[in-house]
């Protein structure tokens, strides 16, 4: 369920940060990417190429659950959803 997904995401994030592991995560979930990532690369449809690159900057980087509570989180999500012609 969604609640467990959020908690698992937080656990993975903490492990990555504690062990200082560079990670490439592929997702179709814009909200997850905006909460989790330092950089988001948006791809086009086939043939795939890079459409845009976004550096995600929070005043204080926290875990994904707390990042979702920040006002800038919605700005990042809306910008990327707009690029994808969702909103």
Predicted regions and their residues:
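Extended, non-globular alpha-helical segments
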Residues: 1-2, 75-87
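Helical segment within the ABC ATPase nucleotide-binding domain
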Residues: 5-19
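Conserved H-loop
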Residues: 20-26, 29-35
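Conserved catalytic segment of ABC-fold P-loop ATPases
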Residues: 35-42
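Conserved beta-strand-loop-alpha-helix hinge in the C-terminal portion
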Residues: 45-76
